[in-house]
Amino acid sequence: MSELIRVPDIGNGEGEVIELLVKPGDKVEADQSLLTLESDKASMEIPSPKAGVVKSIKAKVGDTLKEGDEILELEVEGGEQPAEAKAEAAPAQPEAPKAEAPAPAPSESKPAAPAAASVQDIKVPDIGSAGKANVIEVMVKAGDTVEADQSLITLESDKASMEIPSPASGVVESVSIKVGDEVGTGDLILKLKVEGAAPAAEEQPAAAPAQAAAPAAEQKPAAAAPAPAKADTPAPVGAPSRDGAKVHAGPAVRMLAREFGVELSEVKASGPKGRILKEDVQVFVKEQLQRAKSGGAGATGGAGIPPIPEVDFSKFGEVEEVAMTRLMQVGAANLHRSWLNVPHVTQFDQSDITDMEAFRVAQKAAAEKAGVKLTVLPILLKACAHLLKELPDFNSSLAPSGKALIRKKYVHIGFAVDTPDGLLVPVIRDVDRKSLLQLAAEAADLADKARNKKLSADAMQGACFTISSLGHIGGTGFTPIVNAPEVAILGVSKATMQPVWDGKAFQPRLMLPLSLSYDHRVINGAAAARFTKRLGELLADIRTLLL
């Protein structure tokens, strides 16, 4: 029987087909990867939900696919008709399955043991569109007693660190992962012995032997069959693959290669069956840097930028090398990419917030009564949301073609949070529809999650504009880097009391420094000046937000 295999739920957005891993006539197993999709956030391999033979392929390299699009047509194995045909052709064979059929009967008495019935598989929950994440900490071990919602492991993706809690109380029987492993949604974390879960567990062992026995028997020969063909691949280990369609690498390796601007077909594979590992990419980058260095002062890197000479700092004194967290590494790569791709200009201005501050202080008691702390941030969020609707170019992104603007009808604003592991930017959605107290509560909650590694990847996506405030630390101004594909970011520094001429005398006024960095391809200087001028007017008299 033929079935159409479609793209499963891949989170928000769509992905480009960068690699086809099968061809018509290939025999595939359940969960075997069919193709690799690359979105603007990650690359992911799409597995086959069933075993069978590839009849035809509906997608090709370069296609853009989304959830529900056709991948291929699969001739599914193991249907009822082939079983009947075997029964007619060889009467002796059906006796074997029948002989196996009573086997589950004794096994039905075995699951009655409460120990086996109470074991649950604890798996990685939905971690959003991040796809994969590295295990950076395992907090339990076999034999430990855990409570519901107690943290089991800490995962770190390219967007955030998060702790995965236990969904139930129980005793850890075995831990299936270790520090350094890369896991995704649905991967097994550990086995947990839970009391009172026997009925649900009994049904699974009873049904599993009958269903799993045949596929298990089929999968092993199938996996063994292609092994000799692929066994030729490790032989030339160290030789780069020149055929881009046959590069074998996981999503994390592809992401690392993109960050470094490395063409995977040029990388020497050292992994099993010719698979490219992270270490292979790192070695390749080091070789290129050494080659550029030995090429003399005129040598340049892959992007045409002369590399910074390598310096042995230890000859000047004692040094210590401290590893950057993955979050810091990815953040640095993203900032570098934005800086190289976006023509930055920064507009500086000041806003008189004397009256606004008086209003904020006057509402302090009301805010505390509502259980929130009213800071300057919610007022900035509200004012910026007003301006994003008034000046829609600031609420847009440059189309990939570079010939159009994509204007957004929603107003989601990110705000930078300083954490021990690096800078995180949670996003508040529909800022224009929320009150100051609602914004204050949501900002406090997101900032707390960011600092405690509870922030999901989805909570940091979809922003139209970003606010980065250093006012609590100090400074008179800075040049924030635009978080592309956004086109602007507002930097806020420390407010100070300054003398301001009112036409008759100098008056003490509380002045807030503003730094608006913008993408000059989308925003011109006059528009940026209008933005900061209007923002100053709104902050000077926040009653104008009601107009």
Swiss-Prot record:
One of its GO terms (biological process) is pyruvate decarboxylation to acetyl-CoA. The modification N6-lipoyllysine is found at residues 41, 159. The keyword Chloroplast does not apply. Residues 75-117, 202-248 are annotated as: Disordered. Residues 2-75, 119-193 form the Lipoyl-binding domain. Keywords: Acyltransferase, Lipoyl, Repeat, Transferase. Induction: Induced by glucose. Residues 248-285 form the Peripheral subunit-binding (PSBD) domain. Binds 2 lipoyl cofactors covalently. Residues 80-117, 202-231 have a biased composition (Low complexity). It comes from the Bacteria. Belongs to the 2-oxoacid dehydrogenase family. The pyruvate dehydrogenase complex catalyzes the overall conversion of pyruvate to acetyl-CoA and CO(2). It contains multiple copies of three enzymatic components: pyruvate dehydrogenase (E1), dihydrolipoamide acetyltransferase (E2) and lipoamide dehydrogenase (E3). Forms a 24-polypeptide structural core with octahedral symmetry. This is Dihydrolipoyllysine-residue acetyltransferase component of pyruvate dehydrogenase complex. The lineage of its organism: Bacteria, Pseudomonadati, Pseudomonadota, Gammaproteobacteria, Pseudomonadales.
